[in-house]
Amino acid sequence: MRKLARICIICVLALVVLALIPALINGNFQSEPDTTIPPEIDQNALIADASAYFERMCKGDFSTFHEALPSGIKSQTTPEDIKSAWGEEAHKMGVSPSLDTATVTLYRPEFSNQLRVEFSIPGEKGDFCFFINYTLEGSLYNYVVWVH
């Protein structure tokens, strides 16, 4: 029993250290992570940009979004890959993605140098979530189909 307790304590300490690594690397020792959106970012324009991509994908056009991705991301995926991941997750959640039913949120994730526009649509089996990430300067960075 004591050995199990020690292992649990070591695991918890390891998780704490892993959580602190980004702060140590960035020299950010604040107790709270920086989640502020830079004031020079036009939040409405960023949401409109992401929403236009999302709406096109809802209508089946994944090529336009793929072409806009940075070359490093674009070379790792295809429009068909994005469409496939999108379709699988939408089917699994029992939802037909639509901008009209999406809750759209712009935020800066903790310990991140990115801005995220999140599209969340409630489904029969959970929420379908699609993230479009931008750099802190407002350039398209990447995307994530949230897999449950």
Show the residue positions of the predicted features.
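Short, low-complexity N-terminal intrinsically disordered segments enriched in polar/charged residues
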Residues: A5, A23-C58
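Short solvent-exposed beta->alpha transition segments
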Residues: A48, S63-S112, G123
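Prokaryotic Sec-type signal peptides and long signal-anchor helices
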Residues: P33, C58, H66-L69, I132
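N-terminal Sec-pathway targeting helices
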Residues: M1-A14
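Exposed beta-sheet edge and beta->alpha loop/turn motif
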Residues: T101-H148
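Hydrophobic alpha-helical membrane-insertion segments, chiefly the h-region
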Residues: A14-N26
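Second-shell loop/turn segments in exported
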Residues: T36-E40, S51-E55, A68-S75, E118-S120
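Secreted/luminal cysteine- and crosslink-motif detector
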Residues: I9-V12, K59, F130-F131
